[in-house]
Design a protein with these regions (language model features):
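Membrane-embedded alpha-helical bundles that constitute the cytochrome b-like, heme-associated redox core
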Residues: 2-200
Length: 200
């Protein structure tokens, strides 16, 4: 496979994720309305849609250690494009957050509650910039890898905390229980891979 075809495949994953996220958000707003209810449903739907891309990005290295094979090799090879696909999909989620904040709040949002999300989007933006090769080269490979590694841990942790909140505080089991179980499984895999000789 040529470098051009591989690069084209990466771009396709990102574009499809972004377009599908937009389509999903538009569908939710069309069916449930453009008010608070429709926007909230769109937020949940786009979060769920983006989650598999994040899981693939975060679990790739552990899968390669624990169960080497074609699937883990593909995930590891496409980890950058999966991460960018997550960023594209979650950008739609951010637009819906902005839409929700523009509506009459019920209940009004608290600054403390918004802080983790704001920080996470800042981290994610930095990761996207570092994924651009000239920027990564100017920053230095070691610093770029460190930012991507720490940023990925941060993003996955914040997403998991959101799932915990959805299950144990808001009791939205139908939406968040299965994703939470998947997130816990990924953490268990990474711990096992970390303890494995030559682990992550």
């Amino acid at each position: 496979m040529s470098a051009e075809r591989m690069h084209g495949g990466d771009n396709a994953i990102v574009l499809v994720a972004g377009a599908a996220g937009l389509g999903l958000a538009a569908l939710c707003l069309a069916l449930a309305g453009t008010g608070q209810q429709g926007t909230t449903i769109g937020l949940r739907a786009t979060a769920l849609f983006s989650f598999p891309f994040l899981v693939g990005t975060y679990a790739a290295s552990a899968l390669a250690v624990l169960w080497p094979g074609k699937l883990s090799e593909w995930l590891l090879f496409r980890r950058r494009s999966l991460g960018l696909a997550f960023s594209a999909a979650i950008a739609v989620h951010l637009a819906l957050i902005a839409r929700l904040l523009s509506l009459p709040p019920s209940p009004p949002p608290k600054v403390l509650g918004l802080t983790p999300g704001v920080l996470t989007y800042m981290v994610l933006a930095a990761m996207v910039l570092v994924s651009i090769r000239p920027i990564a080269k100017a920053m230095g490979p070691a610093r770029a890898r460190l930012l991507l590694r720490v940023g990925l841990h941060w993003v996955f942790a914040v997403f998991t905390l959101g799932l915990l909140k959805g299950v144990f505080i808001r009791h939205y089991y139908a939406w968040w229980l299965l994703p939470l179980m998947i997130a816990m499984t990924v953490y268990a895999m990474r711990i096992r891979a970390w303890r494995h000789p030559g682990g992550v």
